[in-house]
Regions:
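Short Gly/Ser/Thr- and Asp/Glu-enriched loop/turn motifs at secondary-structure junctions
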Residues: 103-107, 146-149, 285-289, 334-338
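Gly/Gly-Pro- and Ser/Thr-rich, intrinsically disordered tail segments characteristic of DNA damage-repair
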Residues: 1-227, 240, 278, 364-414
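Short, charged/polar surface micro-motifs in flexible loops or helix N-caps
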Residues: 14, 37-40, 297-300, 346-349
Length: 414
């Protein structure tokens, strides 16, 4: 049996590239996608290559980005727009294989083994996909071509932007083994620090090390990294039918004043939940888990999560689940400075599940219709054109920027 043909496609500077399509006047200038630069905790979500050359990095505070690149332009994130582009990219990928596994909004593994005999080898398919992404979507991708997922991802990271890199069996030692160990999937800062203390600096060092010795220091991750470095990854590209291309959609905000009671928190949770639920609906997702994050005015923070009975994208169900979590977990010894809520463990709208015995279908249908009506009004007249009655209790809190810190997170590898 021949080797598999696996591609890993990575949209270059995804958010920034999409924004530049809508802001052509910013091409050739340093641009970063992030929150309001006046906000207390805005960060860079992604930067274009001009900004990166000036030292701007993902995760950098906006004020830090301004320090290293005074001429930078900040563009607020529009996750619904990026998700639409992600769906269009997957439609292109789907013409080459139904075995595609998203890794966040901007990355995907594709198993094109079956179609390689018809459409040509992996490199040819990668080249065709790359050209179509440019001509049809106006964005570039870096594509890795290999016999497994790990080296395909290394290939897409090897050269950016707009590049195709092969990592075949007869060449991965030459191309991959000289790369830093931190380039290997799942070698984060902590693991990289441990490896350095062991005298391991490159992927080749991991490959040549004794597996049992790695295990003695890193536990089972030692064997996993050793197998990855030696090309022994046999994990399949998982066909995604009901899972969403991202694992969560969330929203958080640092409030304009400290929160001092349950009602304050409820108002903010509802504002944030409305944004999260609306984006779930816009992109055809439902969540099976609701998570909240709380930070007090002395910067102590925690997160709590709960499973919902049935997957949902209904605003009230998400907000109520979050508020129940909060009341169960917070003792009000200190005022609250920041609140977040996230819909996690996402599935597509076509996800089927058995309803529980006490499920009220009529009430759920009524809430869905109400959300749809609210969505329509807000599309036409703006987010704040219609609000819930509880938000009238504090117009300052109910006016927090519902889209300020909207975030999405990719699925893990395992």
């Amino acid at each position: 049996m021949g080797d598999r043909v696996i591609l890993h496609s990575d949209i270059n500077s995804c958010y920034a590239s999409i924004e530049l399509l809508h802001h052509p006047e910013l091409r050739g200038k340093p641009v970063a996608v992030g929150g309001d630069p006046e906000a207390r905790h805005g960060i860079v979500l992604t930067a274009d290559y001009v900004a990166k050359k000036h030292g701007v990095k993902t995760g950098m505070a906006l004020w830090q980005a301004r320090q290293v690149c005074p001429d930078i332009t900040f563009v607020p994130p529009r996750m619904d727009l990026y998700l639409r582009f992600s769906k269009m990219a997957h439609e292109i990928y789907g013409e080459y294989t139904d075995l595609q596994e998203p890794y966040g909004i901007d990355e995907s593994w594709l198993d094109v083994t079956a179609s390689a005999s018809i459409k040509g080898d992996g490199y040819k398919i990668a080249h065709e996909i790359s050209n179509r992404m440019k001509s049809e979507l106006g964005i570039t991708v870096s594509v890795g071509v290999s016999f497994n997922k790990i080296f395909a991802k290394l290939g897409s990271d090897y050269k950016k932007p707009d590049a195709i890199t092969t990592m075949y069996k007869d060449e991965f030692q030459t191309k991959a083994w000289n790369l830093p160990a931190s380039d290997l999937l799942y070698v984060g800062r902590s693991t990289d620090s441990k490896l350095r203390k062991m005298g391991i600096h490159t992927i080749g060092d991991i490959a040549r090390a004794d597996e049992k010795w790695l295990n003695s220091y890193l536990g089972k991750m030692g064997s996993i990294l050793w197998a990855f470095a030696n090309g022994y990854d046999t994990s399949p590209v998982r066909k995604e039918n009901t899972s969403a291309p991202v694992k969560s959609i969330g929203n958080s905000t640092t409030t304009p004043r400290d929160l001092e009671n349950d009602e304050d928190v409820k108002i903010v949770l509802y504002v944030l939940a409305e944004s999260v639920a609306a984006r779930l609906r816009e992109n055809g997702f439902r969540c099976r888990t609701v998570e909240i994050s709380i930070r007090d005015n002395e910067l102590y923070s925690y997160t709590k999560q709960t499973k919902v009975t049935n997957a949902t994208n209904i605003t009230k169900e998400i907000a109520d689940a979050g508020f129940r979590l909060f009341k169960q977990s917070y003792n009000w010894q200190k005022p609250i400075r920041s609140v977040g809520i996230r819909g996690a463990d996402l599935v597509n709208d076509n996800y089927w599940e058995q309803l529980d015995l006490f499920h009220n279908a009529e009430l759920k249908d009524k809430m869905m219709k109400m959300d749809a009506a609210v969505d329509d009004i807000r599309r036409r007249f703006g987010f704040y054109s219609i609000q819930r009655g509880l938000m009238l209790g504090d117009t300052i809190l109910s006016a927090v920027n519902a889209k300020e810190e909207h975030t999405v997170h990719p699925h893990g590898y395992f």
